[in-house]
Regions:
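Active-site and substrate-binding clefts of carbohydrate-active enzymes
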Residues: 1-46, 181-191, 195, 210-213, ...
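Short, well-structured secondary-structure segments
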Residues: 3-8, 14-17, 21-116, 140-143, ...
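An acidic- and aromatic-residue-enriched active-site/binding cleft used to recognize and process polar
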Residues: 8-13, 73-75, 107-110, 136, ...
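Generic structural signal for well-ordered alpha-helices
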Residues: 52-56, 88-92, 121-131, 154, ...
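Acidic, His- and aromatic-enriched active-site or binding-groove loops in soluble protein domains
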Residues: 87-104, 125, 137, 158-179, ...
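Alpha-helical scaffold elements lining the catalytic groove of polysaccharide deacetylases
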Residues: 110-133, 195-231, 252-253, 309-317
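Short, charged, surface-exposed secondary-structure boundary motifs
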Residues: 113-115, 173-181, 203-205, 286
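Intrinsically disordered, polybasic Lys/Arg-rich low-complexity tracts
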Residues: 429, 433-483
Length: 483
């Protein structure tokens, strides 16, 4: 029986406000809160929430037969919590069904896997911790930013304990091979790979509402029949796409939600089931290994990383940003680290692309800037202020090794002080407990003594008091006789 593995991605960056050269050193807040609020509220109401309701209906109608996977960046979660908290509740409902697998990824949808392995691993941990806190699910399958992958990244992913990774079925990598199998990484044989079927995924995301497409209109029964007619040995079809495709790029009026709801119905008729990545790799064995010496991604026609690193503007911005990665990781300034997280989002570099033709149109459609050069200038102004703040924390005159040594000493001393404080507190508690257990002394148990009577005056004192009285008495009698 053939399986379809749907993977839906949710991501939103923190958009930068207009930041001029004269703001450097004076304004340390970089974000366009109004744009973030407006965009994520609109997309959540038009896309994320209706799609979540659609998936819930598909799951409930089939008594749990429909399954899929979901990937949400940390920055998207933060914005949903701030502006559309009811959307988080919808996602929790999906998690509670047990039919939706939450995937691992980078917190800010960053390019750290291409620039800094340590920062990449830190981001993945931060993302997965957030997913666990919110949805009670610990991700075990990895999906990198826009499915970026190569042989070196495979080793990093495997070293973090992941057994499965999703990536793109790029033609220049697969050659004559089909993406509809489970593969393994050549540099990490225990890491299983699920590759997206670009053609079938684009038939929904790109062609569903295209009247010039030769297969228009696309219906659920037609789509499922294409999958069912694939060669018998091709057992898994991976369809990876952005969740805002549904309701935003393909508005509800196109019938996209009804199309999705009908898929499980026709799937049951034609022997096609729906699965999660974990279930797919549990049932199917890898048929071959895949070697990817150069990075691939799910963006643009070339299926490489030129969308973010294709020109000097992008490479310069990335180089400047990640040059301070180690220093930022060593600091304890919460606000500085938060800005570091947000400035890593791949979207900032995507807006700087100078590509032409179809790729260029796609970049321009998503960009809030008038041109790639405006995107670069604004980002570099923000980055300049950020670097000034990093310099204030840790001057460049101190090299990283010396800085690391000093900070390690400070942290060790802080840990020792904390340990000693705990020891003092423990000793005080022990002393108090010991005092309570001591037996009471006889004096403490004896009845309280009656108050002492006033002591009698000594005889000498009595006589001394009597002498003046005696002296006065005879004198009085003598005066009477004289009279």
């Amino acid at each position: 029986m053939k399986s379809v593995c749907f993977y839906f991605k949710i991501h939103q960056p923190y958009r930068l406000k207009r930041y001029r050269f004269f703001d450097i050193g004076n304004d340390h807040y970089y974000y366009d809160d109004f744009a973030d609020d407006e965009i994520i509220t609109r997309i959540a109401r038009n896309s994320y929430m209706p799609m979540a309701d659609t998936l819930l209906e598909m799951i409930n109608r089939g008594n749990g037969d429909f399954k899929c996977a979901l990937s949400i960046s940390g920055t998207a979660i933060e914005q949903l919590q701030m502006y559309v908290p009811e959307c988080i509740d919808k996602l929790r409902q999906l998690a509670d069904t047990g039919c939706v697998e939450f995937l691992s990824g980078t917190y800010s949808h960053s390019l750290a896997s291409l620039e800094d392995p340590e920062e990449f691993m830190r981001e993945v941990k931060a993302h997965d911790d957030l997913i666990y806190r919110l949805f009670g699910r610990k991700p075990s399958v990895f999906a990198n930013t826009e499915l970026i992958y190569d042989d070196d990244i495979a080793m990093l992913i495997a070293s973090m304990g992941f057994k499965t990774c999703l990536t793109v079925g790029a033609k220049h990598v697969l050659g004559w091979k089909s993406p509809n199998y489970v593969y393994r990484a050549c540099t990490a044989p225990k890491l299983k790979l699920l590759l997206t079927n670009d053609k079938l995924a684009e038939d929904i995301s790109m062609n569903f509402n295209n009247p010039e497409w030769d297969e228009y209109p696309l219906t659920a029964d037609k789509y499922i029949s294409w999958i069912a007619s694939l060669p018998e040995e091709e057992q898994v079809v991976n369809l990876f796409m952005s969740m805002d495709t549904f309701g935003s790029f393909l508005p509800a009026g196109t019938g996209i939600f009804e199309f999705m709801k009908a898929l499980p119905v026709f799937g049951k008729e034609m022997g096609v089931q729906f699965t999660t990545p974990s279930d797919a790799v549990a049932k199917l064995k890898p048929v071959d290994e895949i070697s990817v010496p150069y990075p691939i991604s799910d963006i643009d026609e070339a299926r490489d990383v030129s969308a973010w690193k294709g020109n000097e503007l992008q490479r310069e911005a990335l180089s400047k940003l990640y040059a301070v990665a180690e220093r930022v990781s060593l600091c304890d300034d919460r606000r500085l680290k938060q800005d570091w997280e947000y400035l890593q989002s791949s979207d900032h570099f995507y807006y700087m692309s100078t590509k032409n033709m179809a790729d260029g149109a796609s970049h321009a459609a998503f960009s809030p800037y008038d041109s790639p050069f405006a995107a670069f200038t604004n980002y570099m102004n923000v980055l300049a202020d950020f670097l000034v703040r990093v310099e204030e924390q840790y001057p460049e005159s101190i090299d990283n090794e010396e800085l690391n040594s000093l900070l390690l000493t400070i942290r060790n001393q802080a840990a020792e002080i904390s340990s000693l404080k705990k020891e003092v507190t423990s000793l005080r508690t022990d002393v108090m407990n010991a005092e309570e257990k001591l037996p009471e002394t006889p004096e403490a148990t004896a009845a309280p003594a009656k108050p002492a009577r006033k002591p009698r005056a000594k005889k000498a004192e009595t006589a001394a008091k009597a002498e003046p009285a005696a002296a006065k008495a005879p004198a009085k009698r003598g005066r009477k006789k004289a009279e």
